UniProtKB/Swiss-Prot annotation:
Motif ('HIGH' region): 69-80
Annotated keywords: Aminoacyl-tRNA synthetase, ATP-binding, Cytoplasm, Ligase, Nucleotide-binding, Protein biosynthesis
Chief localization: cytoplasm
EC number: 6.1.1.4
Reaction(s) the record says it catalyses: tRNA(Leu) + L-leucine + ATP = L-leucyl-tRNA(Leu) + AMP + diphosphate
Recorded name of the encoding gene: leuS
Gene3D superfamilies reported for this sequence: HUPs, Isoleucyl-tRNA Synthetase, Domain 1, Valyl/Leucyl/Isoleucyl-tRNA synthetase, editing domain
UniProt keyword annotation of Thylakoid present: no
Annotated GO MF terms: aminoacyl-tRNA deacylase activity; ATP binding; leucine-tRNA ligase activity
Family: Belongs to the class-I aminoacyl-tRNA synthetase family.
Subcellular location per the Swiss-Prot or TrEMBL entry: Cytoplasm
Organism expressing this protein natively: Bifidobacterium longum (strain NCC 2705)
GO cellular component terms attached to this protein's record: cytosol
Protein name: Leucine--tRNA ligase
C-alpha cells in the first residue's frame, strides 16, 4: 500500500463533528442570533417593544434570571456557569412553549471585591472592572447563553446609579406607620415622611420630647425638626455601635461578619465601635419578612435561614427606673420571660449604653471591693471598661465559654413589680445593638446570669420549679446551678397591692405560658410595660468608608443638618480621582478611626447649591453605599434599562412581574425563576425583599415579593493535588497510575508521588478549568451538555474533564444520524417510523417534558441518549423521529441542534419552534427491554410485557441464550422482572 493510500484512509471526513467543527458551528449561530435578535423579549411599550415579530400581545410572560456576577477577577472557571446554564436551558424551553421570555444578564460591579482587585493590580477600579466585564461578557456569550443583550447593564453605569440613589431617596423620605394598612391588607406600611410631618403639625401625633411643653411643630428649628424626623426615617443617621474592621478600613454589617468575629472578606478582626453611620430600619419589616415567606416558592432551608436570622420572639418590654444625680432615667429592657421578673436580682447594660453617661462621681456606701474593679470611682471604672470592651470582637464578647467580666456602675434600678433596688452593672456580654442594650438578670433561670451572680456574690432566686410529673426536682439545682426551662410551675412570684406598685399580682402555681400572659396584662395596666415582639435582626448598617460605591444623595449644611438632594441632581457620580485606596490600619488597631477616601477630595465635597432658600455652602456625604445597594433592585431594571423616566414603568412591571402575570407565580407575582447560591440567603435576598416591600408600600411596584421561585444550584467541585511537601501542583499535569494495594488509584506529578484531595475549584488550588479551555477542546455544546448531565442541579458534583468525552460522543452519534460526514448533507428518510420507534419517541417526549418542567436536565439527557441509541440501530433514521429529538435537545446543546435543523431544510431558527407534544396513542410503557446476563455480561435483550410473570421471563431468557449454555442446566438463575435475568452457568 502506498503512502498516499495510507494517508487517504486515515484522513477524517470533512464534516465529522469534532472540536474544530463545533467551534465553527457555534460562532456561526451566535452571530446569527445576535444579528436577528433571536432572544429579544418584547415589552408592552417603549423602546424594547420590538420582539422581532414575536410581540408581547397575547403571549404569556416568563421572567427567568440568575444572581448576576461580580466582575472582580480575571474571568470564569467551569464551576461558575452552572446556574447560568440551568437558567438558559429553562429559558429556551419556555420560548419553545410559545412564551415571551425575559432572560438577561448584568454585572454587580460596585463594592469591596472590585475595589480590592483594583488595589492588587494597581489600577483604578473603573478600569479593571470594565475590563473584567468585557472578558466575562465574552465568556458568557461564547457559551451560547440566550440573553436579550439590549437589557445588559452594570451597577456602575451612571443611568443605573441614578435610580439606586433615587430609591435611597424614597426610603430616606419615608417612615413606617404601624397603624397604616399596606397594599396587602395588613397593618404597618411605609408612608411618605410628609404624612408624619402633617400629623405633627395637626397635633394628631405627639411630638417626641415635647409632649408636655406645649411646643408646636412650627416652633421648632429646622435642625430640631430634622433630629426628630431622623428617629422615624427608614434610612437614618445614628451614632451607634458598629462593626469596625481596621484591616479593611471600613465598617461592616452584621451579615458581613463571621461567627468567629472576623470579616467575611479577608478574615480580619472586627471590633465594636460607636460611630456615626447610615442605617436602614429593616427591623420594622421583621414580621412581614417572616410571614410572607409562606407565599413564595423557595427552598425550605433558605426560608428557615431567614426566619432564624430575623429571629422573631414574643415577650415584653419593661421599664425600670434608674435613679441618677440628673433625676430618674428610664431603662427599657426586652425579655422573652417576663414571668421571671420576680427573680431579677440585678440588671446589666452594655458598655455603650447611654445610662453610663450618668454614673455617680463616687462609689455608694458599702459597695463590695470586687464590684469596683480596682477603680477609685465609677467614672474611671466605666471609662476603662468601655475601652477594654472596644478592643474585643463581638464574638469574644458573647462567647459563652469565656470569662464573665463586668463592674458595678454605682447606679441602681427599681424592679417595677417588686420595688426592689437592683444594682446596675455593665458587662461586655450585653451588646448595644441587640435588644435595648440592657437586660434584667435572673440567675435562677439563666446560666450566664448565674455565673455572673456567683462571681459577684449576688443573690439567686428561683421562680420556676420542674413540672410534677417530670421526674426532676428543684433541689437538684438550688445552690448549684440555674433551672433553665421554658416550662414548669411558677413559684416565689407574688406581690401585695400597694399604692406605689399598683394591684396585687401572683403568678404562683401557674404554668410558664399562663404566667407570661398574666404578667404582661399587669405590666400594661400598671403603665410600666407591655407584651411585644422583638427581633434578632438588627437595622441594616448602610454606609461604608470606601471609594468604589454609590455616593449618597445627601449634603450637610454648616450646622450639620442633612439635606436630600432633588431628583433632578441625580446621579451623583464618583469623582475620577487617583487616590481611591481606602485607609487601612493594623488589623488589631481597635482605636483607629475610619477615613473615607472621598473626604480627601475637597473640590468634590464642598459645593455651592440652591436648595430652595438661596445659594449656600454644603458638604457632600463622603461615605458610599454598600455593594448590596445595586443588587437590591437590579431584577426590575432588566424590564427596561433604557427607560429614563421611571425606575420601572408600571404597565411593564405588571406584565413581567405583577400578580397573576402567569400561572407560575400566581397571585403573588415576582420573578418567575431566580437561580443562585444559598450563600446569599441572609444578605442579598433579605435586603432585596426589604427594599421591594418599601417600594410596594409606596405604590411603585405591585407585587409584595421580588422573587416568586428561588432555586439554589449546587457547587461544582474538583480534585486538587499536592506534592509530598503539601504544595499544590497543577491538576492538568498530574498523571493517574495503577491502583495500589487498597484498590485506590495512584498519582504522580513530574515523576514524583502526588496526593489527591477533593473540594473547591480555585486558582490557589491549581485545579481551575476555564470555559475557554472547554470551548477550544470540546466546543460549547459539549461543555453545556456535560454540566447539565453531571447530576441533579441542586446538588454539588465533582468535575472530571476525562468524563466530558462521553457527551461529545453522544453529540457525534446524533450528528451522524442526521448528517453525512462526507458530504455534510442531511441523510434521513421520509418514511413513517415503525411502531416500536413511535412508542419510544412519544414516551421520550412525555418523559423529557416532565423532566424539563421539574428542572432535571440530567435525567432528560439520559432519556434522549436512549432514543438516539435506538435511532442509531435503524437502517435509516426517520425525519419524523429525529426532528423531535433535535428540538428536545436544543435547550441544552443549541448550536449543533440549530445546524442540524438547518440541514434538514428549515429556514428559521428552531429557538421559537413549538416544543414537541407526545401523541397519547403511543404513550405508556406496555413493553420493556429485558436484559439477559451470563456471568455479568449481556448476552441477549428481549422485548417483554411490563407485567410479565417471572417464570415466563425465565423461560424466554433461557431460550434466548440456550446455545451459550451448551445444553446444560444453569447452576443459578436470578430473575428481577421485568428488566433483568442473571444466569450463573454450570461449571
Amino acid at each position: 500500500m502506498s503512502d498516499n493510500e495510507k494517508s487517504t484512509q486515515t484522513e477524517e471526513p470533512n464534516f465529522r463533528y469534532n472540536a474544530a467543527l463545533a467551534q465553527d458551528i457555534e460562532n456561526k449561530w451566535q452571530k446569527i442570533w445576535d444579528e436577528q435578535g433571536t432572544f429579544w423579549a418584547a415589552n408592552v411599550n417603549g423602546d424594547l417593544k420590538d420582539g422581532k415579530g414575536r410581540n408581547a400581545e397575547g403571549r404569556t410572560a416568563y421572567f427567568a434570571m440568575d444572581m448576576f456576577p461580580y466582575p472582580s477577577g480575571k474571568g470564569l472557571h467551569v464551576g461558575h456557569p452552572l446556574g447560568y446554564l440551568a437558567s438558559d436551558v429553562v429559558s429556551r424551553y419556555h420560548r419553545m412553549k410559545g412564551e415571551n421570555v425575559l432572560h438577561a444578564m448584568g454585572y454587580d460591579a460596585f463594592g469591596l471585591p472590585a475595589e480590592q482587585y483594583a488595589v492588587q493590580t494597581g489600577q483604578h477600579p473603573r478600569v479593571t472592572t470594565e475590563a473584567n466585564i468585557a472578558n466575562m461578557s465574552r465568556q458568557l456569550h461564547r457559551m451560547g447563553l440566550s440573553f436579550d443583550n439590549r437589557r445588559t447593564f452594570a451597577t456602575i453605569d451612571p443611568g443605573y446609579v441614578r435610580w439606586t440613589q433615587w430609591i435611597f431617596s424614597r426610603i430616606y423620605d419615608s417612615w413606617y406607620d404601624e397603624d397604616a394598612t399596606n397594599p396587602s391588607g395588613s397593618k404597618g406600611s411605609a408612608r411618605p415622611i410628609a404624612e408624619l410631618v402633617a400629623k405633627f403639625e395637626s397635633g394628631e401625633k405627639a411630638i417626641p420630647g415635647h409632649e408636655s411643653d406645649g411646643k408646636q411643630w412650627s416652633d421648632l428649628t429646622d435642625a430640631e425638626q430634622q433630629d426628630i424626623l431622623n428617629d422615624f426615617r427608614l434610612a437614618y443617621i445614628s451614632k451607634s455601635p458598629v462593626n469596625w474592621c481596621p484591616g479593611l478600613g471600613t465598617v461592616l454589617a452584621n451579615e458581613e461578619v463571621t461567627a468567629e468575629g472576623k470579616s467575611e472578606r479577608g478574615n480580619f478582626p472586627v471590633f465594636q465601635r460607636e460611630l456615626r453611620q447610615w442605617s436602614m430600619r429593616i427591623t420594622k419589616y421583621g414580621h412581614r419578612l417572616i410571614a410572607d415567606l409562606d407565599g413564595i416558592n423557595w427552598p425550605e432551608k433558605v426560608k428557615l435561614m431567614q426566619r432564624n436570622w430575623i429571629g422573631e420572639s414574643h415577650g415584653a418590654s419593661v421599664h425600670f427606673i434608674v435613679a441618677t444625680a440628673d433625676g430618674d432615667k428610664d431603662m427599657e429592657i426586652y425579655t422573652t420571660r417576663p414571668d421571671t421578673l420576680f427573680g431579677t436580682t440585678f440588671a446589666v447594660v452594655s458598655p455603650e449604653h447611654h445610662l453610663l453617661e450618668n454614673v455617680p462621681a463616687e462609689w455608694p456606701a458599702d459597695v463590695p471591693e470586687d464590684w469596683k474593679g480596682g477603680y477609685a470611682n465609677p467614672v474611671e471604672a466605666v471609662k476603662a471598661y468601655r475601652l477594654a470592651a472596644e478592643a474585643k470582637t463581638a464574638k469574644d464578647r458573647v462567647n459563652e465559654a469565656g470569662e464573665k467580666t463586668g463592674l458595678f456602675t454605682g447606679l441602681y434600678a427599681t424592679n417595677p413589680i417588686t420595688g426592689a433596688k437592683l444594682p446596675l452593672f455593665t458587662a461586655d456580654y450585653v451588646l448595644m445593638d441587640y435588644g435595648t442594650g440592657a437586660i434584667m438578670a435572673v440567675p435562677g433561670g439563666d446560666q450566664r446570669d448565674y455565673d455572673f451572680a456567683v462571681k459577684f456574690g449576688l443573690p439567686v432566686i428561683y421562680t420556676v420549679t420542674p413540672l410534677p410529673d417530670s421526674g426532676d426536682d428543684l433541689a437538684n439545682y438550688e445552690g448549684k446551678a440555674p433551672f433553665v426551662s421554658h416550662d414548669g410551675i411558677v413559684i416565689n412570684s407574688s406581690v401585695e397591692a400597694t399604692e406605689a406598685k399598683g394591684d396585687a399580682l401572683s403568678l404562683n402555681g401557674l404554668r410558664v405560658d399562663d404566667a407570661i400572659a398574666k404578667v404582661n396584662a399587669w405590666l400594661e395596666s400598671a403603665g410600666v410595660g407591655k407584651g411585644t415582639v422583638s427581633y434578632r435582626l438588627r437595622d441594616w448598617l448602610f454606609s461604608r468608608q470606601r471609594y468604589w460605591g454609590e455616593p449618597f444623595p445627601i449634603v450637610y449644611g454648616e450646622d450639620g443638618t442633612p439635606h436630600l438632594l432633588p431628583d433632578s441632581a441625580l446621579p451623583i457620580n464618583l469623582p475620577d480621582v487617583p487616590d481611591y485606596e481606602p485607609r487601612t490600619f493594623d488589623p488589631m488597631d481597635a482605636e483607629s478611626n475610619p477615613e473615607a477616601p472621598l473626604s480627601r477630595n475637597e473640590d468634590w465635597v464642598k459645593v455651592e447649591l440652591d436648595l430652595g432658600d438661596g445659594k449656600k455652602t454644603y458638604y457632600r456625604d463622603t461615605n458610599t453605599m454598600p455593594n448590596w445597594a445595586g443588587s437590591c433592585w437590579y431584577y426590575m431594571r432588566y424590564i427596561d434599562p433604557t427607560d429614563t423616566k421611571h425606575m420601572v414603568e408600571k404597565d411593564e412591571f405588571d406584565y413581567w412581574m405583577g400578580p397573576n402575570h402567569n400561572k407560575y407565580s400566581g397571585d403573588e407575582g415576582g420573578v418567575d425563576l431566580y437561580i443562585g447560591g444559598v450563600e446569599h440567603a441572609v444578605l442579598h435576598l433579605l435586603y432585596s425583599r426589604f427594599w421591594h416591600k418599601v417600594l410596594f408600600d409606596l405604590g411603585y411596584v405591585d407585587s409584595a415579593e421580588p422573587f416568586h421561585k428561588l432555586f439554589n444550584q449546587g457547587m461544582i467541585q474538583a480534585y486538587a493535588y499536592t506534592d509530598d511537601r503539601g504544595q499544590y501542583v497543577p491538576a492538568d499535569e498530574v498523571v493517574e497510575g495503577p491502583a495500589d494495594a487498597s484498590g485506590e488509584p495512584t498519582f504522580t506529578w513530574n515523576g514524583e508521588h502526588a496526593n489527591r484531595e477533593f473540594g473547591k475549584m480555585g486558582k490557589s488550588l491549581k485545579n481551575i478549568v476555564t470555559p475557554d479551555y472547554m470551548y477550544e477542546n470540546y466546543g460549547a455544546d459539549t461543555f453545556r451538555l456535560y454540566e447539565m448531565s453531571m447530576g441533579p442541579l441542586d446538588e454539588s458534583r465533582p468535575w472530571n474533564t476525562r468524563n466530558v468525552v462521553g457527551g461529545m460522543r453522544f453529540l457525534q452519534r446524533l450528528w451522524r444520524n442526521v448528517v453525512d460526514e462526507t458530504t455534510g448533507q442531511a441523510h434521513v428518510t421520509e418514511d413513517t417510523p415503525d411502531e416500536k420507534t413511535l412508542k419510544l419517541l412519544n414516551n421520550t417526549i412525555a418523559e423529557v417534558t416532565a423532566e424539563m418542567e421539574g428542572m432535571r436536565p440530567n435525567t432528560a439527557i439520559a432519556k434522549l441518549i436512549v432514543l438516539n441509541n435506538h435511532l442509531t440501530g435503524l437502517k435509516a433514521v426517520p425525519r419524523a423521529a429525529v426532528e423531535p429529538l433535535i428540538l428536545m435537545l436544543a435547550p441544552i446543546a443549541p448550536h449543533i441542534c440549530e445546524e442540524m435543523w438547518s440541514k434538514l431544510g428549515h429556514a428559521e431558527s428552531l429557538s421559537a419552534e413549538p416544543w414537541p407534544v407526545a401523541d397519547e396513542r403511543y404513550v405508556g410503557h406496555d413493553t420493556v427491554t429485558a436484559v439477559v446476563q451470563i456471568k455479568g455480561k449481556v448476552r441477549a435483550k428481549l422485548e417483554v410485557p411490563v407485567d410479565i410473570d417471572p417464570a415466563d421471563l425465565e423461560k424466554q431468557a433461557l431460550a434466548a441464550v440456550a446455545d451459550r449454555l451448551g445444553g446444560k442446566e444453569p447452576r443459578k438463575v436470578i430473575v428481577k422482572a421485568p428488566k433483568i435475568v442473571s444466569i450463573v452457568p454450570a461449571e
